[in-house]
Every structure is written in C-alpha cells, then in structure tokens.
Amino acid sequence: MACPKKKTSNAKRDQRRAHWRKQAAREAQKALSLGKSVLSGRSNSFVYPTKEEEEGEDEE
C-alpha cells in the first residue's frame, strides 16, 4: 500500500535554495564580466559585428 512522503525539512529546503542562488550569482558575475570586456574592447575570444562592418554590408 502507498504511504505518504515525508516532508522536506526547512534546513534542506534552504540549503537547496542557497546553492541555486549561489550558482545564479556566479553566472551573473560571468555575464557582467564578459559584457565589460566587450565594451572595453579587450575581448578577442569571439567575433561580433561592428558598426563599420554593418554599414559596409548595406552598400553592397
């Protein structure tokens, strides 16, 4: 016969939420760092279109 599940404790719930929030904060920090790198012009790890290239494509 089926028996009801035990309730998850508040400590376990808080521990899981803290882990999730820590991961989200880490990813947000990475995204912010990458954005700053792109805006400062120091990034050379990937290619993205610049305004000069976009204007040149329209004339062709």
Curated annotation (Swiss-Prot):
Molecular function in Gene Ontology: structural constituent of ribosome
Region of interest (Disordered), ranges: 1-60
Protein's UniProt keywords contain Ribosomal protein: yes
Entry's Gene Ontology cellular component terms: large ribosomal subunit
Any Pfam family matching the protein: Ribosomal_L32p
InterPro entries: Ribosomal_bL32, Ribosomal_bL32_plant/cyanobact, Ribosomal_zn-bd
Gene3D superfamilies cross-referenced by the UniProt entry: Single helix bin
Keyword Ribonucleoprotein: yes
UniProt keyword list: Ribonucleoprotein, Ribosomal protein
GO biological process, one term: translation
Biased composition regions of type Basic residues, renumbered to the chain: 1-23
Coiled-coil ranges per UniProt: none
NCBIfam families on file: rpmF_bact (TIGR01031)
Protein family per UniProt: Belongs to the bacterial ribosomal protein bL32 family.
HAMAP family found in the cross-reference section: Ribosomal_bL32
Protein name: Large ribosomal subunit protein bL32
